[in-house]
Amino acid sequence: MKKDIHPEYKKVVFLDTSTNFKFLSGSTKGSDETIEWEDGNTYPLIKVEISSDSHPFYTGKQKADKVGGRVDRFKKKYNLQ
């Protein structure tokens, strides 16, 4: 790798603002806000609106809309069911 062209990779705390869930991970994104983590160290705090704690795919609360495709619409239009 070339020197001095890659962003600094460091540990940060992500805060899901919709559920107040926090997790420690690595990132190149920085922040002026900091938070003290469970290990006693202070890390930059990055606020996110959606994480694996609140996203419907991971929580199992997703909606399964049954929207027909073109064939289904054609059959319905011409009463070919």
Curated annotation (Swiss-Prot):
A molecular function (GO) term: structural constituent of ribosome
Keyword tags: Ribonucleoprotein, Ribosomal protein
Xref: Pfam families: Ribosomal_L31
One Gene Ontology term, aspect cellular component: ribosome
KW Transport (keyword) present: no
Example GO BP: translation
Signal sequence bounds: none
Cross-referenced InterPro entries: Ribosomal_bL28/bL31-like_sf (IPR034704), Ribosomal_bL31 (IPR002150), Ribosomal_bL31_B (IPR027493), Ribosomal_bL31_sf (IPR042105)
PROSITE patterns recorded: RIBOSOMAL_L31 (PS01143)
SUPFAM superfamilies from the UniProt entry: L28p-like
Subunit field text: Part of the 50S ribosomal subunit.
Family the entry assigns: Belongs to the bacterial ribosomal protein bL31 family. Type B subfamily.
Stated name of the protein: Large ribosomal subunit protein bL31B
Organism of origin: Oceanobacillus iheyensis (strain DSM 14371 / CIP 107618 / JCM 11309 / KCTC 3954 / HTE831)
Gene that specifies this protein: rpmE2
